Amino acid sequence: MKKIISLLALTIIFTAALAAQDATIYLWRNIKGMEKQPSVMFMHKPVEGSPNTRTAVIVCPGGSYHHLGLKSEGNSTATWFSQNGVTAFVLKYRSAESLYHHPAMLQDIQRAIQLVRENAEEWNIDPNKVGVIGFSAGGHLVTMAGEFWQTHDEIAKLGIPCSVSLRPDFTVPVYPVVTMQDDIAHRWSRNSLLGKGKKNQTQERKDEFSMELNVPADMPPTFVVVCDDDPVVIPENSLRLYAALQEKNITCHLAHYEWGGHGFGMKDCPFMDEFHWNEELHVWLKDLGFME
């Protein structure tokens, strides 16, 4: 009897897991020379009965560009968006843990944006309502997506035909890595992105990948989240980005909290119970026409 109950419990857990994730999309399937690349994104469709926003968001977990917090920052975020009528795609992008550095990560997020837009009709998505949200190093990645969609078109460099824009419609960097400058850079993320050593980390490259130095005039609307007590990424990263966005008159918002630390994502925790930062994001996205 105990064995039957255990098997039933496992079946329920497995079924719930399947229900939460609707499809696995391989980014580089059938792309010559890229077929063996492991990058995938996990699709979470809007929950039945939720608003028909036709908005999509690509979720980029953090992990210092070395590994990925798929569960803590990826799945919890995708669940919240899907409950609010947004199709979410958790991006498992390549990282230094598997010996990948730039441009692998940027290739992956640009390819993800391309695939979402190219399949928008099939997936009930408005191609003009495709945003990105990222945490920590993932915050740097989504900011790159917002800044580099023209200057660093990795899809074109690979010779892949693309008839859609690679510009996200909104960008949400959460406790993000922003700068590569020596004074406040998150060194692990910098090493993972650029590679170690002076040859890989020239001042020119540090400037190129410092997001606060490269905000374009057509940067997407950006919502930045930061906590003063962040023990991992120095909060000044977010403040520099926000100042740069304001200087360029970009539509932006700074969700600035006294405490909360780092790595909370959208999972249940004391910080979320106290501040509900995702509800502040909800209001902002609603005002822009991306949520209801």
Where are these regions (language model features)?
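Active-site glycine-rich loops that stabilize anionic/oxyanionic intermediates
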Residues: 61-66, 228
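Mobile cap/lid helix-loop segments that gate and shape the active-site cleft of serine hydrolases
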Residues: 30, 176, 180-214, 220
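C-terminal catalytic histidine-bearing segment of alpha/beta-hydrolase fold enzymes
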Residues: 44, 225, 236-292
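N-terminal cap/lid segment of alpha/beta-hydrolase-fold proteins
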Residues: 21-52
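Short beta-strand element of the alpha/beta-hydrolase
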Residues: 53-62
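Primarily recognizes the serine-hydrolase "nucleophile elbow" in alpha/beta-hydrolase
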Residues: 114-185, 206
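Short beta-strand/loop motif that positions the catalytic acidic residue
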Residues: 224-226, 230
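Catalytic nucleophile-loop/oxyanion-hole region of alpha/beta-hydrolase
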Residues: 69-71, 76, 91-127, 270-275
